[in-house]
């Protein structure tokens, strides 16, 4: 098995991950199931990320630990009326996670781009595809560069 990957009592895969913002002020760790990486194409995620979609993975219940810094919190009200706390770095603005509004959240939707092991995580499903930007569903054929041209 890969380093940092095991099984939890439920039989699901568990992978320990660490994460941080771009400037390093905020650090955290959690356990995730790498088979649960998701892409969301909803218009809220497009706006909140400033791009075509958001990629997240839920932390396993009770495993999220904030190791350093204090994130800024933005509370978003969904179309359903549910409230979600979105955390980001107050210095560099990196989106970090979202969780249910209120005390003692159980699980955190970790932003894959903030995870140190993000290259090991591949999305397994997509949601809100009806809101997807048409070009975002197929990037084949677009000119590619190893670095900024």
Feature-to-residue mapping (PLM):
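A short Gly-Trp-Pro
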Residues: 2-149
